[in-house]
A protein has these predicted regions:
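Glycine-aromatic micro-motifs
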Residues: 1-123
């Protein structure tokens, strides 16, 4: 749902506005989930070996939130994400069950970096 990626229209068509690009607290792991298309990231909070993950903060009108959440397929959902600044905000999280067949891509530090590496390797 990040800006300029395939599912971003699900935010913008509901009047969501981009607030800022930032990072999570260094308490998460990032995975490329099995299945698709589209390819989907899954971010999971961990007790150790976590890392800061690049993310975007968007503001959506409350009246549009329910229709947006209905579009989110399992194992993804909306939960509480801690930012690098310590704020706790609603954001995408992934259930542990979604990690079956997933690839740990935490080393890339974010979904865009992972996508860029895939594009570069396919050239």
């Amino acid at each position: 749902h990040m800006a300029d990626l395939p599912l971003n229209h699900q935010l913008t068509s509901r009047g969501a506005e981009f607030i800022e690009a930032t990072e999570s607290a260094a308490k998460y792991r990032l995975y490329a989930l099995a299945g698709g298309p589209p390819m989907r990231p899954g971010m999971v909070r961990v007790n150790e070996d976590g890392r800061a993950i690049k993310l975007e903060i968007w503001r959506m009108p409350a009246a549009a939130f329910a229709s947006f959440v209905e579009l989110i397929p399992s194992p993804l959902g909306i939960g509480t994400v801690e930012t690098a600044s310590g704020k706790r905000i609603p954001g995408f999280i992934c259930e542990q069950a979604g990690l079956i067949g997933a690839t740990d891509i935490t080393e890339f530090g974010g979904w865009r970096s992972f996508l860029a590496s895939k594009a570069a390797s396919s050239v």
